[in-house]
Regions:
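Cytosolic nucleotide-binding catalytic cores of signal-transduction proteins
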Residues: 259
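A eukaryote-biased signal for long
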Residues: 95-100
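Cell-wall glycan-active module
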Residues: 79
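Short linear capping/connector segments at secondary-structure termini
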Residues: 204-208, 275-280
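Substrate-binding/catalytic groove segments of enzymes
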Residues: 262-274
Length: 318
């Protein structure tokens, strides 16, 4: 029978059903409370991220299409929390799987502020961890932009890439080369490759002095000669009076990182990669930390755009 560690005591998850657990109003023998937090290594989610056709991991939940769903607290870097009562609802095979990642909590481990607000205070709130917060901000931002301008800044992903948003996440371990590359690829497809180039192009004012200067730097006489989505986006920003070279440079660097996978980084072209290593601090921090920072900067990018173009909707929170 699958078991869970609760304060170093093993309990049978299969037997700890809702009707056998204690709650804040009724004690049921020595059995623990329904909402007792059970801790798991965050790698427990890898199985579900890797099979998006069958499973969905989202802010506060993980589930199997048409079979089961589980409330979770995934607003942490290295672990996931599940209230004990929900574990009892899993089918036996899933209980065994989760058991393999069960850990006893350390002193600094606890329920996130997000989960506390939702579970204890029964209030709605945004997640705080970079990947979850970015995905929430991205959807909200694109909707606000379309409401404001009549067209979305980011187009929907093509069918074969629809899973990219669904599975986009921070790393569950400090370093995972293949997963790091996969997340950078997903981020690039979701943001940079999805720029609504047709609508962006139509809004560029070639007579704007800043646009003229930008085109001259590229040896172009018209914005219609621009091919890359980022180039068009930068010209659009200049046309609107927004000059944010650092923000655009960040997007370009992410795109370059996408083009330089682990295999490329192991090549001899170190000079081509030196600036990327330095910019993202890939030699100083773990891939997990680097990716989290990229998510944070992507959120900052969206907030910067919202503050400039839609100040009436901006909450200025990062």
């Amino acid at each position: 029978v699958a078991q869970a560690l609760i304060n170093n005591v093993k309990y049978s998850v299969a037997e700890l059903r809702k009707d056998t657990l204690s709650n804040y109003f009724v004690a049921n023998g020595d059995n623990p409370l329904e909402m007792t937090p059970i801790f798991f290594k965050k790698e427990v989610l890898d199985k579900y991220y890797s099979n998006p056709n069958k499973y969905t991991v989202s802010d506060g939940s993980v589930g199997c299409e048409g079979s089961w769903s589980l409330y979770i607290d995934n607003d942490h870097r290295s672990y996931v929390i599940v209230p004990l009562v929900y574990l009892g609802n899993l089918e036996y095979s899933e209980q065994l799987y989760w058991k393999g990642y069960n850990v006893s909590p350390e002193k600094d481990m606890g329920v996130s502020k997000t989960a506390y607000t939702r579970w204890k205070e029964v209030n709605i709130c945004n997640p705080m961890f970079p990947d979850l917060y970015f995905k929430s901000c991205f959807k909200q931002f694109n909707k606000k932009w379309e409401n404001q301008f009549g067209w979305p800044l980011f187009l929907p992903l093509v069918e074969e890439d629809e899973h990219r948003y669904k599975t986009l996440h921070c790393l569950t371990t400090e370093n995972n080369h293949s997963d790091f590359d996969e997340q950078i690829l997903s981020m690039t497809k979701l943001v940079i490759d999805s720029f609504n180039q047709k609508c962006i192009q139509s809004e560029i004012d070639d007579s704007n002095p800043d646009v003229e200067s930008y085109l001259k730097q590229k040896n172009f006489s018209s914005s219609t000669e621009l091919k890359a989505g980022i180039d068009k986006f930068q010209a659009f920003l200049l046309s609107e009076g927004m000059n944010c070279p650092d923000m655009v440079d960040f997007l370009r660097k992410v795109q370059s990182l996408r083009s330089n996978s682990v295999a490329h980084r192991k090549s001899n072209k170190r000079k081509d990669l030196a600036k990327l290593y330095e910019y993202f601090k890939l030699d100083e921090f773990s891939e997990q930390q680097v990716l989290e920072d990229i998510f944070v900067k992507m959120v900052r990018t969206l907030k910067t755009l919202e503050k400039f173009f839609m100040p009436q909707t901006s909450d200025n929170n990062e």
